Amino acid sequence: VKSNDGRIDPQGTCIGMRGSRVNAVSNELNGERIDVVLWSPETAQFVINALSPAEVSRILIDEDNHSVDVIVTEDQLALAIGRGGQNVRLAADLTGWQLNIMTIEEADERHEAEDSVIRNVFVAHLNVDEATADLLVQEGFATLEEVAYVPANELLEIEGFDESTVEI
């Protein structure tokens, strides 16, 4: 739900006093459970709202694959996923995005594995040692093309880089 009037609480209005409105609709639907979710034009906020009451720690949006990595603490994992995956499935249907729920530890492991792959590519193709490849990864470089198109003077600004490193 959404309201264009900032003075109105759209969720509270739909739910009613002590749930009277939503209970009336639920009774009409033979006791079907109803969630009232606050709509947002921003994907990250809409996903957070759709997974409520689970508390989301971080969100990583992958526009290319139309997926969202939702990172939660260990104690929030079961709440975010729901019984039999029901919560995450409903949130994915509602938002139109593929949702991947993971713990902070799983996200860190995944990030480290991705960094390791990038680091190995840099070592293999740029003829640099692992320490230099680590510096490139820490600076946010993810592809060979990104490194190739950065002016030499910008690479020299990276701590630990000198002219001999940049020439490689």
Can you describe what each PLM-predicted range is?
Residues 1-168:
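RNA-contacting regions in translation and RNA-metabolism proteins
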